[in-house]
A protein has these predicted regions:
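Short, low-complexity disordered leader/linker segments with a strong preference
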Residues: 1-38, 59, 407-418
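Extracytoplasmic/periplasmic solute-binding protein
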Residues: 137-141, 146, 156, 170-218, ...
């Protein structure tokens, strides 16, 4: 899913305090007793699929009832932080990469190492994303990669050949210039200030890094990372993308949906909305991202985790394991909302929208790079936005903005280690 930028959390201290101040509210019910589990999720679009999965689980486990609690993503982690600090978080809930280490490091998640989960059933990048200090805390639910969505009608009108899987950065940049027609309000691409969909991908394609493998230092000031950032600022300066101010007024996502953007770097999750839109339903298609110095795309995905203070740990663990089963994955895939993480179940998702080449998102798995995270990802996510905004609005050079970001990010990472 698209990971919206959020302000730096103050959750660390609250979660640390709650880790020692609270304990499980009660012991797990006996094997013969009836229990109700609370299941926290944030996407209403996926609720129908989750209800089907819950129904299948309850049929197999008549003594367990699962109550799905949907909280909008904008409020989800704020409410979860409060609930976890007070010992009342859902028994099982969705977790994403940027927040995972914060909760795992503060003892809020239950180890699933003994839940009978075969981690070879999922992409290794997703398994490792939800592992902390060698312990598995999350069961991979789904994953997403980023592809090049494009408007076939705009390409045809401009006489430009459609993108292929062999496109390079140069091919993409040349097409963006030819497709831009400001007299019609059409731009080649929207260079949004988004890491997951845009600049993380080009940083990795240029051979750069966002954060070091040990999570202790920023990679933004390397020549390769700067090249990956300039990929986007150059498109803005040349006029092949709207300005940052224009994109703040009208998001490129909306421009693409309305036929005013020829190309859009977007996720596998966008298929649902594009298929429901009158314009993109028939005019859009997708292929793999263009190749830079090398191929790369960001991979991210959600996991189901168990609250360490659940009153029903055995039942919660059992439900989490079921959520990671092939049966649950098949249900998710059939709805077409997300790519299920369980290996071998993805083709049903591909077939859900035959008008699009969704296989492209799976073809990228061999070179996918995990979404960059640390113990307090949100702290330096905020620094990315504040510093790179100056480069995106062209008021500051990319090397200068990257240098300032590196200094501030290194300080934030050093604070994590204290």
């Amino acid at each position: 899913m698209r990971l919206k930028r959020i302000a730096a959390l103050t959750a660390s201290l609250a979660l640390v305090a709650s880790a020692t101040a609270c304990s499980s509210s009660s012991s797990s019910a006996s094997s013969g007793g009836k229990v109700t589990l609370n299941y926290g999720i944030w996407d209403q679009t996926q609720e129908p699929a989750m209800k089907q999965i819950v129904a299948a689980f309850e049929k197999q486990n008549p003594n367990i009832t699962v109550d799905i609690q949907v909280t909008p993503y904008t409020d989800y982690f704020t409410k979860l932080q409060t609930a976890a600090s007070g010992g009342s978080a859902p028994d099982v809930f969705w977790m994403n990469g940027p927040n995972f280490q914060l909760y795992a490091s503060n003892g809020q998640l239950m180890s699933l190492s003994n839940a009978g989960i075969d981690t070879s059933d999922y992409p290794s990048s997703m398994v490792n994303l939800y592992k902390y200090n060698g312990t598995q805390y999350g069961v991979p639910k789904d994953f997403d990669t980023v592809g090049l969505w494009y408007n076939k009608a705009i390409f045809k009108a401009a006489g430009v050949a459609l993108p292929t899987a062999n496109w390079t950065w140069a091919d993409f940049q040349a097409a963006a210039a030819k497709l831009t027609d400001k007299s019609k309000g059409i731009y080649g691409v929207g260079a949004t200030l988004e890491g997951q969909e845009n600049y993380y991908n080009t940083i990795f394609q240029a051979g750069g890094t966002v954060i070091s493998a040990d999570g202790k230092s920023s990679g933004y000031d390397s020549a390769a990372s700067i090249s990956g950032l300039e990929f986007w600022t150059n498109l803005i300066s040349k006029g092949d993308s709207p300005t940052l101010a224009q994109m703040n007024d009208t998001a490129p996502y909306d421009m693409f949906m309305s036929g005013k953007l020829a190309m859009f770097w977007g996720g596998s999750w966008d298929a649902v909305a594009f298929a429901a839109n009158a314009n993109t339903k028939t005019n859009a298609d997708v292929t793999v991202l263009p190749e830079g110095v090398k191929r790369a795309t960001v991979i991210h995905g959600l996991a189901n985790v168990v609250y360490a203070k659940s009153a029903h740990p055995d039942q919660a663990e059992k439900f989490a394991a079921f959520l990671g089963s092939k049966q649950a994955a098949d249900i998710e895939a059939s709805t077409g909302t997300v790519i299920p993480a369980y290996n071998g179940t993805q083709q049903a998702w591909v077939k859900a929208y035959p008008q699009y080449d969704l296989q492209s998102f799976l073809d990228e798995l061999s070179y996918a790079v995990p979404y960059p995270i640390s113990k307090d990802t949100a702290a330096w996510n905020a620094l990315e936005t504040s510093n790179l905004t100056k480069a995106w609005d062209l008021s500051e050079s990319v090397p200068t903005a990257a240098s300032q970001l590196t200094t501030q990010m290194n300080a934030a990472l050093a604070k994590e280690a204290q």
